[in-house]
């Protein structure tokens, strides 16, 4: 699912992950963080809205990070939330967050990747936010998602082009693999998946994709 250096990067990044939601010193850093926060906040809001009403539903949060989405959905009434992340540090943060929020009993966080997850399980909603940036084989990811989702899956894909994309490529070049997309590339990626409905929306520095199973 990921290269070793991507996994190592996110293990080291876990402790500082919350910084993207806060103000850091320096005008340039503040601008970069504001830009990324805009995308992150938009996709967070759209995902929670897309899952509503979540009462009694099940959710699989792939690349769950520190559990922001998982815990929020559990707090809103999700019956069961499973969060997967290949970075052990992120899983630890997610478990701590769930405990502090009082929803640990409905959240199951695992140090595991998508491809090792059991195909026989299925969930009402799947979430893949900030994950496709690092997936070298997106078709295989989508194929796996369709085996697991009963209702809707929500994914973000980073936009290629412009200064922010260039800056990310430069910053990540020696740290972990990074995959960016144009709208045309994204449309072509989903073209073979004719059995589902796919909606692609532009949100700041990301494409927000909703995959809906047909009744």
Which residues make up each language-model segment?
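Conserved beta-strand signature within the Rossmann-like core of class I S-adenosyl-L-methionine
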Residues: 150-158
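A short glycine-rich, Lys/Arg-flanked "PGG" loop and its adjoining helix->strand segment in the class I
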Residues: 139-151
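Class I SAM-dependent methyltransferase SAM/SAH-binding core
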Residues: 68-113
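Class I SAM-dependent methyltransferase "Motif I" SAM/SAH-binding loop
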Residues: 63-65
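Short alpha-helix
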Residues: 177-194
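A short SAM/SAH-binding and catalytic strip from SAM-dependent methyltransferases
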Residues: 125-136
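Conserved class I S-adenosyl-L-methionine
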Residues: 1-51
């Amino acid at each position: 699912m990921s290269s070793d250096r991507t996994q190592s990067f996110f293990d080291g990044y876990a402790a500082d992950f919350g910084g993207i939601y806060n103000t850091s010193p320096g005008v340039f850093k503040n601008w970069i963080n504001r830009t990324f926060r805009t995308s992150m906040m938009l996709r967070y809001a759209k995902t929670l809205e897309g899952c509503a009403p979540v009462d009694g539903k099940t959710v699989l949060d792939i690349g769950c990070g520190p559990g922001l989405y998982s815990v929020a959905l559990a707090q809103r009434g999700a019956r069961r939330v499973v969060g997967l992340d290949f970075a052990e540090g992120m899983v630890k943060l997610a478990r701590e967050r769930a405990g502090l929020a009082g929803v640990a009993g409905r959240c199951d966080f695992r140090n595991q990747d998508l491809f090792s997850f059991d195909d026989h399980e299925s969930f009402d909603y799947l979430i893949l936010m900030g994950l496709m940036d690092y997936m070298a084989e997106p078709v295989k990811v989508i194929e796996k998602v369709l085996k697991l989702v009963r209702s809707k899956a929500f994914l973000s894909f980073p936009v290629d082009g412009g200064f922010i994309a260039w800056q990310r490529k430069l910053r990540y070049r020696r740290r972990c693999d990074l995959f960016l997309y144009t709208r045309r590339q994204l449309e072509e990626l989903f073209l073979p998946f004719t059995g589902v409905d796919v909606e692609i929306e532009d949100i700041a520095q990301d494409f927000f994709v909703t995959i809906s199973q047909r009744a």
